[in-house]
UniProtKB/Swiss-Prot annotation:
Protein name as it appears in the record: Uncharacterized protein YrzO
Organism: Bacillus subtilis (strain 168)
InterPro entries: YrzO-like
């Protein structure tokens, strides 16, 4: 169940990153911050 929730959260973030790229707003810093937040949340939940 927990893995399924992580999958849907990850899928949502991937879709958001794809939308950012598709709209031509290739803001690498914004993407890096979003990925860092995801990593922090995943590691916090796992521990």
């Amino acid at each position: 169940m927990f893995e399924g929730l992580l999958f849907f959260i990850s899928a949502g973030i991937v879709c958001e990153l794809a939308a950012i790229n598709r709209n031509g707003r290739k803001n690498i810093k914004q993407q890096a911050e979003l990925i860092q937040i995801l990593k922090e949340n995943l590691y916090k939940d796992i521990k």
